[in-house]
C-alpha cells in the first residue's frame, strides 16, 4: 500500500450517445432531498468519463444506481497529473420516474488501496419518447468532487461537489 493522498480530486462526465450530447440538470430548490436534479433518458446509453488526480490512483468500475459500469483506462494526461477512465452506462429497462417525483441513486467507485468514493445523485428518468423534457434546464459537462480518504482506507469523505 502506498501513501494515502491528502486530497483526491475526481470528475465524472456523462454524455448521451450516439452523438456525445449534453446531459442537463435543473435546480429544484428545497422541494426534494437535494436541490439539483440530473435528467436522464430511459433506453439510452451514456458515455461515462472519470478523471482522477493524483494519477497514481486506480479504479476498475463505477456503480450508478446499482448498474455496474466497467471502466477502461483511456489515458494519463500529458502533464501526468490526472488519469482518465471511460465506460458506458445503459438505462435500458430503467422505469421512468413518476411526475412530481425524484429518485436518489447511489454512486460508488471503489479505489484500489484508498477506499470507496460514494455519493448520491438526485435523478429523474424520462421516458425515451419524451426526450424533449430531458433537454430543459442547464447543461453540465462534468461534476467535480474534492474528497479526503479516511485513515482506515475504507471510504472517502466528499468535501465539495460542483456542477460545471
From Swiss-Prot:
Disulfide-linked positions: none
Organism listed in the record: Homo sapiens
Gene that encodes it: CNRIP1
Lineage: Eukaryota, Metazoa, Chordata, Craniata, Vertebrata
Biological-process GO terms, alphabetical: negative regulation of signaling receptor activity; regulation of signaling receptor activity; regulation of trans-synaptic signaling by endocannabinoid, modulating synaptic transmission
This protein's name: CB1 cannabinoid receptor-interacting protein 1
A Pfam family hit: CNRIP1
InterPro entries in alphabetical order: CNRIP1 (IPR029204)
Family: Belongs to the CNRIP family.
Gene Ontology terms, MF aspect: type 1 cannabinoid receptor binding
PANTHER family: CB1 CANNABINOID RECEPTOR-INTERACTING PROTEIN 1
Cellular component per GO, a single term: cytoplasm
Self-association and partners: Interacts with the cannabinoid receptor CNR1 (via C-terminus). Does not interact with cannabinoid receptor CNR2.
Amino acid at each position: 500500500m502506498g501513501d494515502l493522498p491528502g486530497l483526491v480530486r475526481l470528475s465524472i462526465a456523462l454524455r448521451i450517445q450516439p452523438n456525445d450530447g449534453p446531459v442537463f440538470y435543473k435546480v429544484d430548490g428545497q422541494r426534494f432531498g437535494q436541490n439539483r436534479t440530473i435528467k436522464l433518458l430511459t433506453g439510452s446509453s451514456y458515455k461515462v468519463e472519470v478523471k482522477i488526480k493524483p494519477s497514481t490512483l486506480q479504479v476498475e468500475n463505477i456503480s450508478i444506481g446499482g448498474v455496474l459500469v466497467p471502466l477502461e483506462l483511456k489515458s494519463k494526461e500529458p502533464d501526468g497529473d490526472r488519469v482518465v477512465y471511460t465506460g458506458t452506462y445503459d438505462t435500458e429497462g430503467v422505469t421512468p420516474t413518476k411526475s412530481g417525483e425524484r429518485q436518489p441513486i447511489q454512486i460508488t467507485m471503489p479505489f484500489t488501496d484508498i477506499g470507496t468514493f460514494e455519493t448520491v445523485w438526485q435523478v429523474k428518468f424520462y421516458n425515451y419518447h419524451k426526450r424533449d423534457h430531458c433537454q430543459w434546464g442547464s447543461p453540465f459537462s462534468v461534476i467535480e468532487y474534492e474528497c479526503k480518504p479516511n485513515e482506515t482506507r475504507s471510504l472517502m469523505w466528499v468535501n465539495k461537489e460542483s456542477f460545471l
